[in-house]
Regions:
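Long, low-complexity N-terminal extensions
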Residues: 1-205
Length: 205
C-alpha cells in the first residue's frame, strides 16, 4: 500500500512518502527512506518494487554525482529528469525497472520544479503528483486545496491532510511518512509523521 506524493509551492517543493518496506503479507520495517537526495538541490521519491527502487535510484544518484565530478557543474532539474527518463526507457527494452518516480529540484534561474515519471518512462512536468494506492486520496485532496503560491506552512498542512486521508481510507494504510523539502537552501529532511516506531531487537544473551 505504498504512497508517494509531491507538490510545488511558491519557492520550494516537497516530497512525502510512506516508510513501510513490505513483501506480500509481511512488513519488514516501518522506517524505510524512499526519498533519495540526488544532490544538493534534487530529491527523488520512488515507489513500487523494492529492489528496483533501491537499485535504480542509487544508479541515478551516482550518475548525477559523476556528471558533476566530470564537468564541475550541477545538472539542472530538467536535465536530471530527462536523463532519468532516458535510462528508464533504455531499460524498458532490455530489463525493465518496476519503479515510479517523483523528481523535485530547485534551480537558481527557474526556481522549484516537479517531474512525474512512471515505470514506462512517461515524463511530465507538473505542480503536484502522486503514486501508489494513496494517490487516489492524495490527488483528490491536492486538487481541492492546492494553490501555486502556497507557503511552507500551508503545504505541510495540506500534506498532513493527505496523510490523514490515506490513513483513514485505506484498509491497510502505511503507518509512517517522511517529508523532505527542497528550496534555495538545498534538499533536506523536513519532518516525520509516525504512528508506530520500530523497536530495536534485543540481543540474545
Amino acid at each position: 500500500m505504498e504512497s508517494v506524493f509531491g507538490l510545488v509551492g511558491k519557492d520550494f517543493a516537497i516530497v512525502a512518502a510512506d516508510t513501510s518496506a513490505i513483501h506480500s503479507i509481511l512488513v519488514h520495517k516501518t522506517n524505510e527512506d524512499k526519498i533519495m537526495i540526488l544532490d544538493s538541490h534534487k530529491l527523488m521519491g520512488a515507489s513500487d518494487e523494492t529492489g528496483d527502487r533501491a537499485q535504480f535510484t542509487e544508479y541515478i544518484q551516482k550518475n548525477v554525482a559523476l556528471y558533476q565530478f566530470q564537468n564541475d557543474i550541477l545538472l539542472t532539474t530538467a536535465a536530471a529528469a530527462n536523463f532519468t527518463r532516458g535510462e528508464l526507457a533504455t531499460a524498458l527494452r532490455k530489463n525493465p525497472y518496476m519503479v515510479n518516480i517523483i523528481l523535485a529540484g530547485y534551480d537558481n534561474d527557474t526556481g522549484p520544479s516537479l517531474y512525474f515519471m512512471d515505470y514506462i518512462a512517461a515524463l511530465h512536468k507538473v505542480d503536484k503528483a502522486a503514486f501508489g494506492y494513496g494517490s487516489y486520496f492524495a490527488l483528490a485532496m491536492m486538487d481541492r486545496h492546492y494553490r501555486w503560491d502556497m507557503t511552507v506552512e500551508e503545504v505541510i498542512e495540506l500534506v498532513d491532510k493527505c496523510i490523514m486521508e490515506i490513513r483513514s481510507r485505506l484498509f491497510v494504510a502505511p503507518p509512517n511518512f517522511l517529508i523532505k523539502i527542497i528550496d534555495r537552501d538545498g534538499a533536506r529532511e523536513y519532518a516525520w509523521r509516525e504512528s508506530i516506531k520500530d523497536d530495536p531487537v534485543p540481543v540474545a544473551s
